[in-house]
Structures are given as C-alpha cells and as structure tokens.
Regions:
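A short glycine-enriched loop-to-beta-strand structural element that forms part of the catalytic core
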Residues: 28, 62-115, 127-134
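Intrinsically disordered, glycine/charged-rich C-terminal tails and inter-domain linkers
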Residues: 116-144
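Conserved long alpha-helical elements within nucleotide-processing catalytic cores of c-di-GMP signaling
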Residues: 1-16, 20, 27-31, 35, ...
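Protein kinase-like catalytic domain
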Residues: 19, 58, 114-117, 121
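Short helix/loop segment flanking the catalytic signature motif in cyclic-nucleotide metabolism enzymes
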Residues: 33-68
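Solvent-exposed, charged/polar functional surfaces in cytosolic regulatory/catalytic domains
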Residues: 14, 53, 57, 119
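A short helix-to-beta-strand capping loop
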Residues: 22-23, 125
Length: 144
C-alpha cells in the first residue's frame, strides 16, 4: 500500500503541475479518482502533457527489467503470482458547452463523467476520452 500512496502523491503533483490555479481546480474524489475542472483554453494540451508527465514520473517505481518488459509480476490480492501492466493514466473528459450547463443536473453530469472515465479505461495504456457537449446534436440522457 505504501507504493500505491507514493503513486497517488506523484499523480497529485503531476495534476497540480499542469493546472493554472487562477482558472482550474484539482480535487481528490477518493482512491485513484481525481476531479479536474479546467477553465483554461488550452485544456487539451494540458491533458496531453499530463499524460506524458505521469508516464515519465512513473518510471521511478519500476526496475529496468520491468520497464523493458512493459509489465511486472507480483502477488495479487488472492496471493497468486500475476502479470500486471505498467501504470498508465486514463482521463475521462466532459467538455461542457455553456448552453448545455443550464440543462444538465448534477446526476446527469456525474453520469457523463462516469461514462467518459469508463471509455478512457477501456483503452490499454494512457488515454483521454472526451464527451463533447459542444458537438452538434448532443442531448443529455434523462437522469434515471
């Protein structure tokens, strides 16, 4: 668990390094989930740099042979040896258009964020998935 805490602190530092504190916000939801509210116009560039930063910073958590192999073997929670991929960052984005903000409630926004994160995590390795509410024809689903 100590190593996991180090990784979370590393991620938090990478997040803080890539935001503009006068326009952006970083929050820790829990576990390995963080929330970014980005008001910066160059948010896409910032997120791409964040992916690079985190990838580079994570190298210190591995031995050379792990980096070369692209994975490592460790005991899983059941005590069995298992191959694990190297750490990667998955970012789910909800790009909000001001007109859509007035029609979304908190549960709809949370659902969109959950969907974006889900799609980002489906990709192997570092990824960003954007749900763009500025896209023509975007209609939020009714809250269930």
């Amino acid at each position: 668990y100590g190593r996991g805490d180090e990784v979370l602190l590393c991620l938090a530092q990478c997040l803080n390094d890539r935001i503009d504190p006068s326009r952006d916000f970083v929050g820790h939801i829990g576990g390995d989930d963080f929330l970014l509210v980005l008001g910066s116009e160059d948010w896409r560039r910032r997120l791409n740099l964040l992916l690079e930063d985190f990838q580079n910073q994570c190298r210190r958590f591995y031995r050379a042979e792990h980096l070369e192999a692209g994975c490592f073997i460790a005991l899983n929670r059941q005590g069995q040896r298992q191959e694990f991929p190297l750490l990667s960052l998955s970012i789910g984005v909800v790009h909000l258009h001001p007109e859509v903000c007035a029609t979304l409630d908190a549960s709809q926004l949370a659902e969109l964020a959950s969907q974006a994160k889900h799609y980002a995590k489906e990709v192997i390795g570092a990824s960003v998935h954007v749900i763009d509410t500025t896209a023509p024809g975007f209609k939020p689903q009714a809250a269930s």
